[in-house]
A protein has these predicted regions:
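Compositionally biased terminal segments of proteins
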Residues: 1-136
C-alpha cells in the first residue's frame, strides 16, 4: 500500500466522522515545492469531545492507536499519532488550537485533487510558519 492510499484511508475516516482537517507538513509541502520522500503524514484536526470515542473506534481496527494518549492530547490540544498496521506509515494528528491564527488558517485551507479523491490542504502562507513553529 502506498502513502497515497494511506492518506485516502485516513481522509475517508475523517470525513465519515465529520471531523474538520487539513493536510500539513512535508506531504503538503510536496504540493507546493520540490517533492521529497517522507514516511509520515501530518494532519491538523479540529475534533470535538463528542467525536473522540468514535475517532478511536474508527482507527482501532486497521491502525495502532493509543487511546489513552489520544484522550490526554485532545484535552491539552497537543498531538498524537496512529500507524497503519499493515504498512509502516505514521500519521501525526495535530490538534488545532483555538487561536485566531489557527482558526483563520482552517478558513484558508484549500481543496485539492489527489488522484481520484480530494483533500483539504493547508495554504502555502500557513504551511511555512507552521513548519517553523513545529521545529522549535
Amino acid at each position: 500500500m502506498e502513502q497515497h492510499e494511506v492518506l485516502r484511508k485516513v481522509v475517508e475516516k475523517l470525513r465519515d466522522l465529520d471531523i474538520e482537517y487539513m493536510l500539513s507538513g512535508s506531504v503538503a509541502m510536496n504540493f507546493y515545492g520540490q517533492p521529497r520522500m517522507t514516511r509520515h503524514i501530518d494532519i491538523i484536526i479540529s475534533i470535538k469531545e463528542t467525536q473522540i470515542r468514535r475517532f478511536i473506534d474508527s482507527f482501532n481496527e486497521e491502525f495502532y492507536i493509543d487511546s489513552e494518549m489520544v484522550l490526554k492530547e485532545v484535552s491539552g490540544k497537543g498531538m498524537f499519532n496512529v500507524i497503519l498496521n499493515d504498512y509502516i506509515v505514521k500519521v501525526d494528528f495535530i490538534l488545532r488550537k483555538d487561536t485566531k491564527y489557527d482558526i483563520n488558517a482552517f478558513e484558508r485551507r484549500r481543496l485539492v485533487n489527489v488522484g481520484d479523491f480530494e483533500i483539504c490542504l493547508i495554504s502555502p502562507e500557513d504551511l511555512v510558519p507552521n513548519k517553523l513553529l513545529w521545529a522549535r
